[in-house]
């Protein structure tokens, strides 16, 4: 008897297609660890090999577009970790996997751990920009957390000595590789924060493999960097090496040398600042002197146009006050300049650029001497012009006119007499001579007749 419902009947092609779709849709991408065997690479550039363990094996294919991203040459017997899609080769019904990426087994497992920790810390917000602390500018003391025998420490110290030899450096030596390294790095970061001697920390090491750099992918190290009150610059490996510490740090430097560049100031730049300050000082002094000279010239011109002795005295008092203010301002300017020079000299002495400092001091002495000479010359010229102005004013004074035999006669109302018609007989007059006054009475008035010229 036939059953009530006939079972589905597959062709071989349909069966293989159905199995392939089930494998691809249900399994998706998987990670597989195994040993390589039967590795071949035909002219097409694709890789064909078998992955096996102690009890089973599976055929694998890795096409050229994928295998060219692999950084090593697979070898027979090598343990690898692959990311692949499971499929079925329909023409032969062979079950196989299509490999998308491949890593040595050890590095592959570490890479998985790296990605998992990165995702975890990122979800907690440890990488957020809002938590990044600004670096001090300039840094007054730098702490270095690295191996005391590694090339990274040598590179950092070399750059700091070249750029800013006066910058203090405190080294917190620690292991940077091995099982004990993460704990030592954490303790060094905590110690630096407890002692609070530095205002920036460089945490890092030289280049190496993923295993060599793994201490800086440790969760304990990442959380210690995040918790540090002192800004941290990560400097792990080479520019292509990126660790968890780089994401958590306040700033990532591609190399230890680059980290030293970031936290230090350039000595040559400091020297350029000194030269620029000196030039601005010279310009300010020249402008100040020119402005005061112009002001003095204006005052002197006004004095020449105004005669009374009282005004002259007031102008002289104002001039003296201006001179005192100018002297006081110049003294303060020189004092501030001297203080700034002393600070810069102390800074430069610590950096030991003695020849340039000596030349700068010589130049400043010359400028001080030149300023003193200019002030003496200006004051001497001012006194001479003032004396000439007084002599000129005395020469045109009415008192000088009286001394030459002239007199001034005024009526009883105080008006100066210029014509005879201003007085009458019997009026009293007052005459001013050089040495006193004469009072007189008008007896007779005799006008002088003006002669008329004939016109031809």
Curated annotation (Swiss-Prot):
Q: Which CDD domains match?
A: ExoVII_LU_OBF (cd04489)
Q: Which GO terms describe its biological process?
A: DNA catabolic process
**Keyword annotations for this protein?**
Cytoplasm, Exonuclease, Hydrolase, Nuclease
Record's superkingdom?
Bacteria
Compartments annotated for it: namely:
Cytoplasm
Under catalytic activity, the entry for this protein gives: Exonucleolytic cleavage in either 5'- to 3'- or 3'- to 5'-direction to yield nucleoside 5'-phosphates
Question: InterPro entries per the record?
Answer: Exonuc_VII_L, Exonuc_VII_lsu_C, OB-fold_nuc-bd_dom
Any matching Pfam family: Exonuc_VII_L
The EC number(s) this enzyme carries: 3.1.11.6
Molecular function GO terms recorded: exodeoxyribonuclease VII activity; nucleic acid binding
A GO cellular component annotated for this chain's UniProt record is: cytoplasm
Function text: Bidirectionally degrades single-stranded DNA into large acid-insoluble oligonucleotides, which are then degraded further into small acid-soluble oligonucleotides.
PANTHER family cross-referenced by the UniProt entry: EXODEOXYRIBONUCLEASE 7 LARGE SUBUNIT (PTHR30008:SF0)
Subunit structure of this chain's protein: Heterooligomer composed of large and small subunits.
Family per similarity comment = Belongs to the XseA family.
Can you name this protein?
A: Exodeoxyribonuclease 7 large subunit
- Species the sequence originates in: Escherichia coli (strain SE11)
Q: Which gene encodes it?
A: xseA
């Amino acid at each position: 008897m036939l059953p009530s419902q006939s079972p589905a009947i597959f062709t071989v092609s349909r069966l293989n297609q159905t199995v392939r779709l089930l494998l691809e849709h249900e399994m998706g991408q998987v990670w597989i660890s195994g040993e390589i065997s039967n590795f071949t690479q035909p002219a097409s550039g694709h890789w064909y090999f078998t992955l096996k363990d102690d009890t089973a094996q599976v055929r694998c294919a890795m096409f050229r577009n994928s295998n060219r991203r692999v950084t090593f040459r697979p070898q027979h017997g090598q343990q690898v970790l692959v990311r692949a899609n499971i499929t079925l080769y329909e023409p032969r019904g062979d079950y196989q996997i299509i490999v998308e990426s491949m890593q040595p087994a050890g590095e592959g497992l570490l890479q998985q751990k790296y990605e998992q920790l990165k995702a975890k810390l990122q979800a907690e917000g440890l990488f957020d920009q809002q938590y990044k602390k600004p670096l001090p500018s300039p840094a007054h003391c730098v702490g270095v957390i690295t191996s005391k025998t590694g090339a990274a420490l040598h590179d950092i110290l070399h750059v700091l000595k070249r750029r800013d030899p006066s910058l203090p450096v405190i080294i917190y030596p620690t292991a940077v590789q091995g099982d004990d390294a993460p704990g030592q790095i954490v303790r060094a970061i905590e110690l630096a924060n407890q002692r609070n001697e530095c205002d920036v920390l460089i945490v890092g090491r030289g280049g190496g493999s993923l295993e060599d750099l793994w201490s800086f992918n440790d969760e304990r190290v990442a959380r210690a960097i995040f918790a540090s009150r002192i800004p941290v610059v990560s400097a792990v490996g080479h520019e292509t090496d990126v660790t968890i510490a780089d994401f958590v740090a306040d700033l990532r430097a591609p190399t230890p040398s680059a980290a030293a560049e970031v936290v230090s100031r350039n000595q040559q730049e400091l020297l350029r600042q000194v030269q620029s300050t000196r030039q601005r000082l010279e310009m300010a002094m020249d402008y100040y002197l020119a402005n005061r000279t112009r002001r003095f010239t204006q005052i002197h011109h006004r004095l020449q146009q105004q005669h009374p002795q009282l005004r002259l005295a007031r102008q002289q008092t104002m001039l003296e006050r201006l001179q005192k203010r100018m002297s006081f301002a110049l003294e303060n300017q020189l004092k501030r300049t001297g203080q700034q020079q002393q600070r810069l000299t102390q800074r430069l002495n610590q950096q030991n650029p003695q020849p340039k400092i000596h030349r700068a001091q010589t130049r400043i002495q010359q400028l001080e001497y030149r300023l003193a000479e200019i002030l003496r010359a200006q004051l001497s010229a001012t006194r001479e012009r003032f004396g000439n102005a007084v002599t000129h004013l005395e020469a045109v004074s009415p008192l000088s006119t009286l001394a030459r035999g002239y007199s001034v006669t005024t009526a009883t109302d105080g008006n100066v007499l210029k014509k005879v018609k201003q007085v009458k007989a019997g009026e009293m007059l007052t005459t001013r001579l050089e040495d006193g006054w004469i009072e007189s009475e008008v007896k007779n008035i005799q006008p002088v007749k003006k002669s008329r010229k004939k016109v031809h």
